[in-house]
Amino acid sequence: MSNVIVVGCGRVGSQLANMLSDNGNNVCCIDKNADAFANLGRNFNGSTVQGVGFDEDVLIRAGVEECDVLAAVTQLDNTNLMCAEVANHLFGVPHVISRLYNPDHERAYMQLGIDYVCGTSLVAEDVFSKIVSGHGSHIDTFGEFEVLRFTLDLSRR
């Protein structure tokens, strides 16, 4: 079981928080808008903290000092970048992952050594793969390695 902080409680953040919580992790969601916590639903077992995700006091209230993983998944690249940097450099969170909205910012994230997921690129690559090959789709990239999904039609033997 891990202690996880999810910054941003929109569609992605709330779904991620619920998935992590349902998987037995201790999850705390941070969002500047208290109304966003309604996205978590009634069955969410974690905690919530209202505030800005890169504010030190907010992170401390969320349990950053015992945190194993922080996922910054707001819709703002600069906010996610700041959250990742504060969690990593000020608090030494072992694993920090950031959502990247604009693929043009990818180089900056790479230069800073921040793990990121770019939904825009993932969707574009997935659609491209389906158009070009019709057989496989890109799931994720981890450094030099890619995870791919393939569908096999065994009836065409």
Label each PLM-derived region with a short phrase.
Residues 1-157:
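Cytosolic regulatory regions of ion transport systems
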